[in-house]
């Protein structure tokens, strides 16, 4: 299993960060990595996510929501083909630093046969996470 994890401190309360993160309709206006998310925000439901890593090929996939805990955590599991080929558990965790700051943790756990040989793609993915982190910080601090 390979894991990418990034974090950033956002000068906004947890509620503001959650609102921006889960306003799927507005993602195309600020998010340079996740170009769109559509679907019902309910655990167990499939959503449609389109991403575009920097200098990488864009892709659209249909992960299942694993967690959607208001003001705390949003997590999904996506699979390439069948389970065990290339699976990604993507997560966003919000931790209250104080009333005016939030730690935004953004990561993904990759598993499956192809996860072991996908090094270059994972670096581009991490770059995409960091770009998104900067963008959500800017959007929340407006």
Model-derived segments and spans:
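Short aromatic-glycine motifs in intrinsically disordered, low-complexity regions
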Residues: 50-54
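Hydrophobic-ligand binding "helix-grip"
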Residues: 38, 55-101, 109-111, 138-139
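Hydrophobic pocket/interface hotspot
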Residues: 17-21, 27, 47-49, 65, ...
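Glycine-centered small-residue hotspots that permit tight backbone geometry or close packing
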Residues: 42-46, 69
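A conserved amphipathic terminal alpha-helix motif
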Residues: 103-142
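Short beta-strand micro-motifs in enzyme catalytic cores
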Residues: 2, 45-47, 90, 102
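Hydrophobic ligand-binding cavity/cleft-lining segments
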Residues: 1-38, 42
């Amino acid at each position: 299993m390979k894991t990418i994890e990034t974090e950033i401190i956002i000068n906004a309360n947890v509620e503001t960060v959650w609102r921006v993160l889960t306003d799927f309709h507005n993602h195309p206006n600020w998010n340079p990595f996740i170009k769109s998310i559509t679907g019902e925000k309910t655990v167990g439901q499939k959503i449609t996510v389109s991403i575009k890593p920097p200098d990488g090929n864009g892709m659209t996939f249909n992960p299942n929501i694993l967690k959607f805990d208001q003001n705390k955590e949003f997590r999904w599991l996506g699979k390439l083909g069948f389970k065990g080929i290339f699976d990604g558990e993507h997560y966003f965790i919000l931790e209250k630093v104080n009333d005016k700051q939030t730690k935004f943790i953004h990561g993904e756990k990759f598993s499956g046969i192809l996860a072991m040989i996908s090094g270059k793609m994972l670096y581009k993915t991490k770059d995409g996470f960091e770009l998104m982190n900067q963008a959500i910080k800017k959007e929340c601090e407006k």
